[in-house]
C-alpha cells in the first residue's frame, strides 16, 4: 500500500480544449516512470475523456463509488478503479451522464482521503466549469495546475479564478501556458498575458510539443510520455514536463509539512 500522504493534484482550466486532459495523462506517465502508484480521477463528469484516451473498458465509475459510500456499501476504492497498466489506475467519470447530476460536492473530500491511502499520486482531471464540485476539488487538493492558452477569453476567465485564489490567500497553484495546442495562435505576447492574468506564468509548453498525429496515440490508448518515439523527437519538451511533475510533488510535500507543523 502507498503512503497515507499521497499527493492530490488537480489539472484545471476555465475553458475547454486547452490540453488539460492531455497534461493529466502525460503527468501520469511521468509519475509511473518515477515508480509512483498513480490514480487518475476523471472529474469531468459530463464529458470525461480519460477512459477513451487510454482505451480502457471500465465497468465501475465514480458515481458507483459515491452511491456505495452513501449507502454504507463502500469497502475499498480499488473496487471502483480500472487499471491501465501495472502502476496507473483510473477512476472513471459516470458512464451515464445523467448520473453526473446526482454527484454531490460533499463526497469529494472523502474520495480524496480514500485515494491517498492507496496511491502515491492522485491526478484529478476537472472540467472547466466553476461549479460547486470543481470549487470543492480546488479547495481540497494539495496543489493545482492551471492550464491557459493564448486566447483572450480564456485568459480573462482565468484571471477571475486567480483573483478568487488571491482573495482567499490560496497559493498552492501553478499557471501553465500551453502553446502546443494551437500553434498558430500567438496573438498576445508573454508580457501581455502576464498583464491580463495579473500574475506570472510558471511554465510554458512550447509549440515544439505540438503532436500533429496525436489521434494515432489516442486510438492506440498510448500515453505520450511513455512512447519511445515521442521521447526521442521531443526529449526537451518531455524533460520540461518532468520538471513540472517534480515541482508538483515538492509543492505537495511543502503543504503537508506546513499542515503538520500547525
Question: Model-found features: residue ranges?
Answer:
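Cytosolic-facing regulatory segments adjacent to core modules
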Residues: 69-133
Amino acid at each position: 500500500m502507498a503512503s497515507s500522504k499521497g499527493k492530490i493534484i488537480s489539472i484545471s482550466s476555465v475553458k475547454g480544449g486547452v490540453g488539460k486532459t492531455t497534461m493529466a495523462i502525460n503527468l501520469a506517465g511521468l509519475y509511473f516512470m518515477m515508480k509512483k502508484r498513480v490514480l487518475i480521477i476523471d472529474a469531468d463528469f459530463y464529458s470525461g475523456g480519460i477512459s477513451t484516451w487510454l482505451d480502457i473498458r471500465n465497468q465501475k465509475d465514480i458515481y458507483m463509488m459515491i452511491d456505495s459510500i452513501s449507502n454504507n456499501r463502500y469497502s475499498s476504492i480499488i473496487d471502483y478503479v480500472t487499471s491501465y497498466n501495472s502502476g496507473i489506475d483510473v477512476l472513471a467519470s459516470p458512464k451515464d451522464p445523467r448520473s453526473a447530476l446526482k454527484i454531490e460536492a460533499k463526497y469529494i473530500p472523502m474520495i480524496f482521503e480514500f485515494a491517498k491511502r492507496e496511491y502515491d499520486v492522485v491526478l484529478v482531471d476537472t472540467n472547466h466549469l466553476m461549479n460547486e464540485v470543481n470549487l470543492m476539488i480546488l479547495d481540497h487538493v494539495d496543489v493545482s495546475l492551471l492550464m491557459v492558452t493564448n486566447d483572450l477569453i480564456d485568459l480573462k476567465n482565468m484571471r477571475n479564478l486567480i483573483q478568487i485564489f488571491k482573495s482567499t490567500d490560496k497559493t498552492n497553484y501553478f499557471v501553465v501556458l500551453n502553446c502546443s495546442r494551437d500553434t498558430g495562435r500567438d496573438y498576445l505576447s508573454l508580457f501581455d498575458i502576464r498583464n491580463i492574468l495579473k500574475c506570472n506564468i510558471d511554465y510554458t509548453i512550447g509549440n515544439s510539443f505540438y503532436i500533429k498525429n496525436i489521434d494515432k496515440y489516442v486510438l492506440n490508448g498510448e500515453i505520450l510520455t511513455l512512447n519511445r518515439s515521442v521521447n526521442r523527437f521531443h526529449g526537451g519538451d518531455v524533460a520540461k514536463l518532468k520538471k513540472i511533475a517534480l515541482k508538483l510533488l515538492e509543492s505537495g510535500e511543502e503543504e503537508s509539512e506546513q499542515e503538520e507543523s500547525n
